[in-house]
Amino acid sequence: MKSLRLFLLVSFVAVVAMPSDACDLCGCYTPQLEAMSGMESQSSKSWWNGFYGAVGEQFTRFATVQIDGREVANPTGQYENSSITQLVAGYIINDRFALQLNIPLIYREFKRPEGFAIDRGTESGLGDASLLLKTVAFHYSSPARRTFEVGGKNPIAIEHEPDFTFSAVLLTGLKFPTGDSSRLEEEFHEIDIPGAPLSGIHGHDLTLGTGSFDGIFGEQTSLRYKNIFLETNVQFTLRGDGTHQYHFANDLGWSGGPGYYFIRRHDTIIGLQFDVTGEYKDVDRFRGKAAEDTGITSVFLGPRIVASRGRWSAEIGAEFPVSIDNTALQVVPDYRVRGGISLHF
C-alpha cells in the first residue's frame, strides 16, 4: 500500500508540462512525487496528510524561422520568449486515486514584423485551468529484502526497498476556458502587404487561453530495477469548440527515457535521466478553414535531474530540438527549460 501511495506522488516529478504545441500551450504539470521516499502510509496519518502542492515552470525560446520544416532567414529578428508557471494543488484520496488542480500563469514577450514596422510587446495573465484525476491502473513490487542488525541483546529487522517496481497511472481531466482568448481576434485583421516581411507570430501564438472546454487523457509509467529507472508520459488533449471562430487542433505530447539514481537512500534521492520528448499537432481551423501555419511535429532531447529530500521533491531539465517539421511559416523553439518543486504534506 505504501509503495502505491508513493507512486501516486513520484511517478509524476516530470514537468509533464508535457511537450507544447507551436503556440506553447503546455500540457498539465503533474509532479512525480514518488521521489518523496520519506513518506509514511497515509493510513497512519491525519486526513490533511493527503494534500500536496507544486510549482512548475516551463520557459521556451522561439527565434528560429521555418517554412514547411526548412529553416529560413530571420531578417527582422522576430522572436517569442514564453514562460508558463503552473501552480498545482492536489489530494491523494486513497492508494489508487488522486485529484489535482492546475492553474497556469503565463508571460510572453515578443518581437515581430507588422507590415513594414516592428511590433514589440508582452502578454501576461491567467491561462486555462485544469482539473485532473490520477488513477493507479497497475502496480507491482518484488518482495522486499530483509536484513538483521545485531548490536544488542535482540537483533533488529531492517526491511529494504524492493529491487524491482513497476507502476502505471491513467490521467483524465477537463480544461476550462479561464484564460483570456481575445488575442485570437487578431486573426480577423491579418493581411499580407506586398514586399513586407512575413510574421511567424500571430494571435494564436500569443493567446492566454483557447476559449474551449478540452478533455485531457494520458498515462504515466515508471519502472525501476535497483538504481536504474525508466519513465514515460503521454498526454492527449481533445479540443472543444473555441471562441472567435477559432478552433485549436487536438494535440499529442509524449516524453520518456532511462535514468540512474546516483543516490537512493531512505530520505534522499538524486538521479539523472536522458529524456526524449515529442509532440504532434494538426492544423487549427479558423472560420471553418485550415489555419495552415499551425501544424507541427517535433522531437527534443535533453538531460533531466531529479532530487528529493524527505517530503520535498524537485527537478530541472533542458530540451533541445533534433527534429521540427512544421507547416507553412512559423517561429519554432530553439530550446526549452523545465523545472518544478513539490511538497507532500
Go through each PLM region and give its residues.
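Outer-membrane beta-barrel biogenesis signature
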Residues: 19-65, 141-166, 180-182
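Residues on the lipid-exposed face of transmembrane beta-strands in outer-membrane beta-barrel proteins
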Residues: 43, 55-57, 87-91, 101, ...
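Residues that define the transmembrane beta-barrel architecture of outer-membrane proteins
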Residues: 49, 81-85, 123-131, 164-166, ...
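Repeated loop/turn-to-beta-strand initiation elements of outer-membrane beta-barrel proteins
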Residues: 51, 63-64, 96-101, 139-143, ...
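Transmembrane beta-strands of outer-membrane beta-barrel pores
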Residues: 57-63, 103-109, 137, 174-180, ...
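Surface-exposed strand-loop-strand hairpins of Gram-negative outer-membrane beta-barrel proteins
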Residues: 59-84, 187, 202-205
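Outer membrane beta-barrel transmembrane domains
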Residues: 64-68, 72-75, 242-345
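Outer-membrane pore/translocation modules
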Residues: 108-249, 308
